Amino acid sequence: MDKQYKVGVVGATGMVGQRFVTLLENHPWFKLTTLAASGRSAGKTYEEAVGSRWAMTTPMPESVKKMVVLDASKVEEVASQVDFIFCAVNMPKDEIKALEEAYAKAECPVVSNNSANRFTPDVPMVVPEINADHIDIIPAQRKRLGTKRGFIAVTRYFRRPKQGMALTA
């Protein structure tokens, strides 16, 4: 793959967000350009926002330490900087659904690690090795949301691709 997609992590300071950050470091398909979290973390560098709560077994990547964390509720600002987001927020399910739909309606695709949309009929839960065809429901979701590009897809986990594995859609 020649192009790297610009991606953001929404909920970047929490445990799952930290995991996304470590997995996206030096990823062949994705360039982590944007980190977003709650208003408490907004405006701080990632290193300041996470502080001693860094929970990963590997050190915080140098490439993100000085990145300024954006306010995840400022959807248009975050969405304008990325091709899509990975969502790992920790909030009540109704708030997660509203936030993820706001990003999708801002024409920003959402790959969610949250359970809030797992039973929404037109939101695919995709485990690529098992059910990649579930993305076929996305046009129906786009119609419901009134979007051309934005959508929500839920995944149960995120890992680096095996060497030589091709990205398919």
Predicted regions, residues:
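N-terminal Rossmann-like NAD(P) cofactor-binding subdomain of oxidoreductases
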Residues: 1-169
